[in-house]
Amino acid sequence: MAKRSPKNEKFFFVYVLGSRSKNNFRTYVGWTIDLERRLQQHNAGVGAKSTRGRKWILLYSEHCKTRSEAMSREWYIKHDRKFRTTLRAIIRT
């Protein structure tokens, strides 16, 4: 079996997007293998239903080595209100 070199190693990213409209600020959490492409999809209306029709910016990302790890982190971040509240506070300042 050939070893995977760091160049060919696939990483999974967990990310948090932010979008502001008038007096409303929203966040969205997801995971992907191509962060730049995924952000473009969200902004083009091809992303998740809840992200359509908004301009999104990347607020936070982290990489994971496995899909399972990325999915677990996504779940954790989605359910960690303190984390998302902290992000909102940073954006508002």
Annotate each PLM feature.
Residues M1-S50, R54, S61, S68-F83, ...:
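GIY-YIG nuclease catalytic motif and its immediate N-terminal context
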